Swiss-Prot record:
It is a peripheral membrane protein. This is Vacuolar protein-sorting-associated protein 36. Transmembrane segments: none annotated. The keyword Lipid metabolism does not apply. InterPro entries: GLUE_dom, PH-like_dom_sf, Snf8/Vps36, Vps36, WH-like_DNA-bd_sf, WH_DNA-bd_sf. Residues 288-300 have a biased composition (Polar residues). Residues 119-193, 213-243, 280-346 are annotated as: Disordered. One of its GO terms (cellular component) is ESCRT II complex. Residues 7-94 form the GLUE N-terminal domain. Its main location: cytoplasm. Keywords: Coiled coil, Cytoplasm, Endosome, Membrane, Protein transport, Repeat, Transport. Component of the endosomal sorting required for transport complex II (ESCRT-II).
Length: 611
């Protein structure tokens, strides 16, 4: 592999630079591949300079001049580039190799590498013998690689142009006398015997065909590759700008087409409406024939009734004319009946436009909008608009209520403090008790939410629930707990959600929060009876205390059933059965005995045998 690159001395981990050479970019953890095989030069540092690419390790340094490079491109290996490091393929005249970037930063290195190839110096150090050996080495690796991001350096001519130069040098260096002098005396005789007069003609035709092919290939090459000078530095940016402009033009054209289509649709709708109006007017004209025709068969419209009424009012208000004026008028009247100048038909067909702007049943064209399918659609649209207005107004009111909810909770806390101070001095009235219960229902000032607590939501919810149950005395004040400090999970869910107001929680969140009571060392615990009833009770509550309370009830009221216990303690029937029979029951403790009748009734008595 050392023959591929030019050896470079390494001093303290840095390569020895050439004159007027400077380092542009460095990338660590880079390996060199010879085709698909990984070489011994791995996990080194690649340095990009103004004249060459240098691979450096602790002991050795390898450099490759920019003048020898024909092509560089990004290479993707594996399935969609998954499971392999990004690579760069560097192609020379008769050989190629790869640089594998294990730590990334391949694209930045490739971008700067291309810029350095465009800006490489015109005079660079001549390659050593090792590089000439590398150029003459054959390329035995036929690699299939991706040509998506290929880059052809415009300063180096293609391979076919180099072959042409080599052939021309061979033709120019041809000397027939030199061959004759080196030949033996027997060779001229053999040449004369093997002389073919058509051979020179065939060679000329072959040369002409080669020249034509070369001209065709040069025409296919872009102009910037035929020129010796590199493309301008802003060439690629200019191409990108052109592409962006083309995309913008296409988008504008699409928008214009959409606007034109919308205009055409609107025009078609207007035409359809006009046709419907004309048909409606024709139907009205056919149904109402002309009421009065003149003697000369000239149909002229009559004045509207409002005009006639206006004229009559003016005549009544004006003073009566003089007799002379009446005589002249009576003399001037013709013997024939007056010829009407108007036709009532046109007056009937004219639309009656109401002055009331809220009248939505009539259109400007004189026919009702509720007629036909169009009228039904208009009514449906009106209803949807009204519903949208109602919803928007109601939601705006809800948003205002949600904003004011926190202020109401803080106010309730202040009032509660004042009431507690008052109860310390004097007795409370019924109104104060009702007001205190109302403040209890107002609930929590700043409830825990998933937005505020995030990953610690259930922990903080469990702590807040425990503090709220203890401070509000929920276990003692709840009617369903009786004398026992115990409440079912369903009742707790209803009370706690009512206290939270708007920020409601799900049953699953409440259950998870209750499960964390013991792990967070809180004074409550969650308990599940064999019947499936789940309750929240005090951590200090035990079975013996429950049994003692049941014994006291039996001593006062006599033998009782599960129904009687549920009625006395105001608890559910299932919870009463669980207290008597399952888990924490007094029967298992041996302090009660039961009497089962044939009818199925079960009564619990004090166990006199133990006493």
């Amino acid at each position: 592999m050392e023959t591929l690159f030019q050896k470079t001395r390494v001093i303290n981990g840095e390569p020895e630079l050439i004159q007027n050479e400077s380092i542009i970019y460095k990338v660590d953890n880079v390996s060199i591949y010879d085709g698909d095989q990984k070489t011994q030069y791995s996990n080194g540092t690649v340095m990009l300079s103004t004249h060459r690419v240098i691979w450096v390790n602790k002991d050795i340094g390898l450099g490759l001049l920019h003048q020898l490079i024909l092509n560089i491109e990004a290479l993707t290996t594996g399935l969609m580039g998954i499971g392999s490091s990004p690579k760069i393929l560097i192609t020379l005249t008769k050989r190629s190799f790869r640089l594998s970037f294990h730590a990334g930063r391949r694209d930045d290195f490739l971008k700067l590498y291309r810029q350095s190839l465009l800006n490489k110096p015109s005079q660079s150090p001549s390659p050593t013998s090792s590089t000439s050996q590398f150029i003459n080495q054959p390329n035995n690796n036929n690699n299939n690689y991706n040509n998506n991001n290929s880059y052809q350096t415009p300063l180096q001519p293609p391979q076919y142009q180099q072959q042409q130069k080599e052939q021309q040098q061979q033709y120019n260096s041809y000397n027939p006398y030199q061959q004759q002098s080196s030949q033996s005396p027997q060779q001229p005789q053999q040449q004369y015997n093997s002389y073919n007069p058509y051979q020179s003609y065939v060679q000329q035709q072959q040369q002409q065909q080669q020249q034509q092919q070369q001209q065709q290939q040069q025409q296919q090459i872009p102009q910037y590759q035929q020129q010796t000078s590199p493309p301008p530095p802003n060439y690629y940016e200019h191409i990108q700008q052109q592409q962006q402009q083309q995309q913008q033009q296409q988008q504008q054209q699409q928008q214009q087409q959409q606007q034109q289509q919308q205009q055409q649709q609107q025009q078609q709708q207007q035409q359809q409406q006009q046709q419907q109006q004309q048909q409606h007017q024709q139907q009205q004209r056919q149904q109402s024939p002309s009421l009065y025709n003149s003697y000369h068969s000239t149909q002229q419209p009559l004045p509207p009734p409002s005009y006639l009424q206006h004229m009559q009012q003016q005549q009544q208000q004006s003073p009566s004319p003089s007799p002379q004026y009446q005589q002249t008028n009576s003399n001037s009247l013709p013997s024939q009946p007056p010829q009407p100048n108007y036709n009532l038909q046109n007056f009937i067909n004219t639309p009656i436009i109401s002055n009331n702007s809220n009248n939505n049943n009539t259109n400007i064209n004189g026919f009702t909008s509720n007629a036909g399918i169009g009228g039904i659609i208009n009514q449906m649209n009106k209803k949807t608009l009204e519903n949208d207005k109602l919803l928007s107004e109601s939601f705006s009111d809800l948003n205002i209520l949600m904003e004011k909810a926190k202020d109401m909770v803080t106010l309730s806390e202040k009032l509660k403090v004042t009431l507690e101070k008052k109860t310390g001095t004097s007795t409370s009235t019924e109104e104060e008790e009702e007001f205190r219960s109302f403040l209890l229902e107002m609930g929590i000032e700043s409830p825990v939410t998933k937005k505020t607590a995030k990953s610690k939501y259930h922990d903080q919810l469990s702590k807040q629930l425990s503090d709220w149950i203890i401070t509000k005395n929920i276990l003692k004040q709840h009617k369903g707990s009786g004398n026992n400090e115990m409440i079912t999970l369903s009742d707790l869910y209803c009370i706690f959600n009512r206290a939270r107001g708007i920020e409601l929680i799900s049953p699953d969140d409440l259950y998870r929060a209750c499960l964390l009571f013991e792990s967070l060392d809180l004074p409550l615990r969650l308990r599940k009876f064999d019947s499936g009833v789940i309750v929240v009770q005090s951590k200090d509550e035990n079975d013996e205390q429950i049994a003692k309370q049941i014994l006291d009830i039996i001593n006062e009221n006599g033998p009782l059933s599960a129904f009687d216990l549920a009625k006395i303690n105001s608890i559910s029937l299932h919870l009463a059965k669980d207290q008597l029979l399952v888990g924490v029951t007094s029967e298992k403790l041996g302090k009660l005995c039961r009497d089962e009748t044939v009818e199925g009734n079960i009564l619990y008595h004090i166990n006199i045998f133990v006493d």
